[in-house]
């Protein structure tokens, strides 16, 4: 970032030049603000590429790029291979409950998808949009632990340019990615909208709010949401400019499903004020969870996180 200079509408001239002139298009602005894809921590192999993995430990990721599996193949047709950086914490039995496959987005990107069957008898499935610096390999253990504790299956996907998904991260791709994930969950697994809970974390709240503003579902969970990209980078921003990225604050009023907002009061990345503002704009907001003292990446470590999720899903949503 440039050194601060004279300010115009809350921005220094140096900040404006760096953000909007190099080059001046919303997709590049969004990329500067949001996307930090890690080196992939997993591969997805088609049946003919599989190699036997040791029981109870993930297989190392092959160096060669895997060929894409057929998108129409049935569940279990592909296999997940995790690298050491994936931090796998479970046995081979749990790994066998994870199904991986590819879908295709409207922008013609190959989308890596994951279905974690944590609670086969559960009514609800979370469509989980993860944060900006992880991929499915790193999130896999968390999904198993979370789903088993809140009694939900979990469907997730990697954004374009993350993990095994093709393309590059962009705002337009975010929206196309979650659309493809939504359709895959509905058609491949037969999950109806009234049984889908949209869960977005950090940058994942952006596609979550966009989808929820267009489709009704069982519920929406916004974990450390942001109002818009500029409001994160420049907290003095009071309105949405035409060049702003991720304008969730302008979409949240169109969400007709129940919305649970979760935010840490000491969030050092997306200020707590973002969660408050999103909560206040929700037409059907339920009691929020403000985690006292929590930052951006540690809310899950607080006991009230799981307690509030269980209360919301098991007692505040229909379960018959």
From Swiss-Prot:
Family membership: Belongs to the AB hydrolase superfamily. ABHD17 family.
Tissue-level expression reads:
Expressed in brain (at protein level).
- Renumbered to this chain, the Pro residues biased-composition regions fall at 55-65
Give the EC number(s) under which this enzyme is classified: 3.1.2.22
- What processing steps or modifications follow its translation? Palmitoylated on cysteine residues located in a cysteine cluster at the N-terminus which promotes membrane localization. Palmitoylation is required for post-synaptic localization and for depalmitoylating activity towards DLG4/PSD95.
Please give the coiled-coil regions recorded for this protein.
Answer: none
Where does it localize? Recycling endosome membrane; Cell projection, Dendritic spine; Postsynaptic density membrane
- UniProt KW keywords: Cell membrane, Cell projection, Endosome, Hydrolase, Lipoprotein, Membrane, Palmitate, Postsynaptic cell membrane, Synapse
Q: Where is this region: Disordered?
A: 50-75
Top-level EC class: hydrolase
Reactions catalysed, as given in the entry: S-hexadecanoyl-L-cysteinyl-[protein] + H2O = L-cysteinyl-[protein] + hexadecanoate + H(+)
This chain's function reads:
Hydrolyzes fatty acids from S-acylated cysteine residues in proteins. Has depalmitoylating activity towards DLG4/PSD95.
Q: What residues form the catalytic site here? A: 202, 267, 296
Name any GO cellular component annotation. postsynaptic density
Recorded topology in the membrane: Lipid-anchor
User: What name does UniProt use for this protein?
Assistant: Alpha/beta hydrolase domain-containing protein 17C
Note the InterPro entries from the entry. Answer: AB_hydrolase_fold, Hydrolase_4
